[in-house]
């Protein structure tokens, strides 16, 4: 009789330490919620959740310093299902910072909207857990599980404004369409497994290299997986849910779902397309990038609701990121990483301002409501202006170098037409961002719209986003070098 032993090496737990921290704090928050009376403020649970995110950042720092963590041969854990490298650590830190900023914005929002749901904070932590696990998973089944953890949390968070019909409607649309998209991804995984006999990204890559000729089913599998992940990043033509969901969901949650899941899904796309060396992906990405930029910018031109405008803007920016994907070289991958981080900072900041200005019931969300904001609240208007200029790509902001890096990498890969489409769309996009600025500084308000005092949590979140946006616009070299190292770690 053979002696069968089932043991997980200690280092494996270190590889998922940030996720373990978030899971523990999420459970603690739910237990603590049961001890707080229903009608009391749940802000203490928000503070506890923020502590959990900070502890997870400490766990990420421990991962980065752990001996042998980056070793190519021993760099995986849980039998090759999880891999921690510069690439995954970068996205872990990014997701943790996004989550921290959203929690800071949520403190005020929950009180102003009179939402007494303690599970709100726990679900944010569990969603962040799923996003982090997506970025380090090298097993397609584990990626699917992490994707579902993140998605289910997002569906629930979108419906947190329970008494508002638009919120329930947006959540239902998100759930139904998200379920279809996930089914496409899972079917693609099943086809890949049927063709290669594995669901491990690196094992699949080796199998595809030895498969001559490639089975046609491989191309179908890659297309199906791209559909599933394209939905998560709000790339055209899988974008139809975005405006309605962003309009109906709570503004802090829109800040989260427009950046966190997008960053995690882009990380998975990078790992699946490049590390797996998936065939047939180039033209899929090319077409989706062109459609996303064009549909997103044209759709935003006719919007009067700021949340819907930023939703279409999010679709357009997904297109810019996909331009970097199409470039396919180290420079293209690093440009996609750099753009993802820059976009997260400026978009979270923009939605933080929208969340604060919307007031009780999210009443003030139209362009007319922003008229005269420069006189009524000069600081808030100035901060929003910086984020909008960065979204345009004006110099001295992170958005400028992000777009410059993306288009440069595309030209280096001879993607001339895609670059031309991107530049034209950037010029079109400048119109609707400047339109908001014109309303804030050059239009008189039709009625007095109140602007509440900026609370400390919101001020801290805005300061984080503002400093990061300006830092990447003034001193981007160090960050670009790290993005390049992350790209090299991914494809080595």
Swiss-Prot record:
Annotated GO MF terms: NADH dehydrogenase (ubiquinone) activity; NADH:ubiquinone reductase (non-electrogenic) activity; quinone binding
Keywords noted in UniProt: Cell inner membrane, Cell membrane, Membrane, NAD, Quinone, Translocase, Transmembrane, Transmembrane helix, Transport, Ubiquinone
Main location, first listed in the record: membrane
EC number(s) recorded for this UniProt protein: 7.1.1.-
Keyword Translocase attributed: yes
Enzyme class name: translocase
Catalysed reactions, as listed in the record: a quinone + NADH + 5 H(+)(in) = a quinol + NAD(+) + 4 H(+)(out)
Location relative to the cell: Cell inner membrane
Presence of keyword Transit peptide: no
TM spans (from-to): 16-36, 44-64, 87-107, 118-138, 140-160, 175-195, 216-236, 250-270, 282-302, 309-329, 333-353, 381-401, 416-438, 455-475
UniProt membrane topology term: Multi-pass membrane protein
GO BP, sorted A to Z: ATP synthesis coupled electron transport
Superkingdom of origin organism: Bacteria
Function recorded in the entry: NDH-1 shuttles electrons from NADH, via FMN and iron-sulfur (Fe-S) centers, to quinones in the respiratory chain. The immediate electron acceptor for the enzyme in this species is believed to be ubiquinone. Couples the redox reaction to proton translocation (for every two electrons transferred, four hydrogen ions are translocated across the cytoplasmic membrane), and thus conserves the redox energy in a proton gradient.
NCBIfam families, A to Z: NDH_I_N
Subunit structure: NDH-1 is composed of 14 different subunits. Subunits NuoA, H, J, K, L, M, N constitute the membrane sector of the complex.
Family stated for the protein in its record: Belongs to the complex I subunit 2 family.
Protein name in UniProt: NADH-quinone oxidoreductase subunit N 2
Species whose genome carries this gene: Koribacter versatilis (strain Ellin345)
This protein's encoding gene: nuoN2
């Amino acid at each position: 009789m053979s002696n069968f032993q089932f043991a997980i090496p200690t280092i494996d737990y270190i590889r998922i330490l940030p996720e373990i921290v978030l899971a523990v704090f999420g459970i603690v928050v739910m237990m603590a919620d049961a001890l707080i009376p229903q009608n009391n403020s749940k802000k203490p649970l928000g503070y506890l959740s923020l502590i959990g995110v900070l502890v997870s950042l400490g766990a990420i720092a421990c991962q980065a310093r752990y001996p042998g963590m980056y070793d190519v041969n021993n760099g995986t854990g849980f039998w090759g299902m999880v891999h921690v490298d510069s690439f995954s650590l970068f996205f872990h830190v990014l997701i943790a910072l996004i989550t921290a900023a959203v929690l800071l914005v949520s403190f005020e929002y929950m009180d102003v909207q009179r939402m007494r749901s303690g599970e709100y904070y726990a679900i944010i932590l569990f969603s962040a857990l799923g996003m982090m696990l997506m970025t380090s998973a090298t097993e397609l089944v584990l990626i699917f599980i992490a994707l579902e953890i993140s998605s289910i949390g997002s569906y629930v968070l979108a419906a947190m404004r329970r008494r508002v019909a638009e919120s329930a409607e947006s959540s239902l649309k998100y759930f139904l369409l998200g379920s279809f998209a996930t089914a496409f991804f899972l079917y693609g995984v099943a086809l890949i497994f049927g063709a290669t006999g594995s669901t491990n990204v690196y094992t699949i890559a080796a199998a595809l290299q030895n498969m001559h000729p490639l089975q046609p089913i491989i191309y179908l599998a890659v297309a199906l997986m791209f559909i599933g992940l394209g939905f998560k990043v709000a790339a055209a033509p899988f974008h139809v849910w975005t405006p309605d969901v962003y309009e109906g969901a709570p503004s802090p949650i829109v800040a989260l779902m427009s950046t966190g899941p997008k960053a995690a899904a882009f990380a998975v796309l990078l790992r699946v397309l490049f590390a797996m060396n998936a065939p047939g992906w180039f033209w899929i990405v090319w077409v989706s990038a062109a459609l996303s930029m064009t549909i997103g910018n044209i759709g935003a031109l006719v919007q009067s609701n700021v949340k819907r405008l930023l939703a279409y803007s999010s679709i357009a920016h997904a297109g810019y990121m996909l331009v970097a994907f199409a470039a396919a070289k180290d420079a293209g991958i690093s440009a996609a990483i750099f753009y993802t981080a820059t976009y997260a900072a400026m978009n979270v900041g923009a939605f933080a301002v929208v969340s604060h200005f919307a007031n009780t019931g999210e009443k003030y969300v139209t362009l007319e409501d922003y008229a005269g904001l420069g006189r009524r609240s000069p600081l808030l208007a100035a901060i929003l202006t910086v984020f909008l200029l960065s979204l345009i790509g004006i110099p001295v902001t992170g958005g400028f170098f992000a777009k410059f890096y993306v288009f440069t990498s595309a030209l280096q890969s001879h993607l001339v037409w895609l670059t031309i489409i991107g530049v034209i769309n950037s010029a079109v996009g400048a119109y609707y961002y400047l339109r908001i600025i014109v309303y804030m500084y050059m239009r008189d308000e039709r009625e007095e719209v109140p602007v509440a005092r900026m609370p400390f949590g919101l001020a801290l979140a805005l300061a984080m986003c503002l400093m990061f946006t300006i830092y990447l616009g003034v001193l981007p070299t160090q960050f670009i070098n790290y993005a390049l190292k992350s790209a090299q770690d991914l494809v080595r």
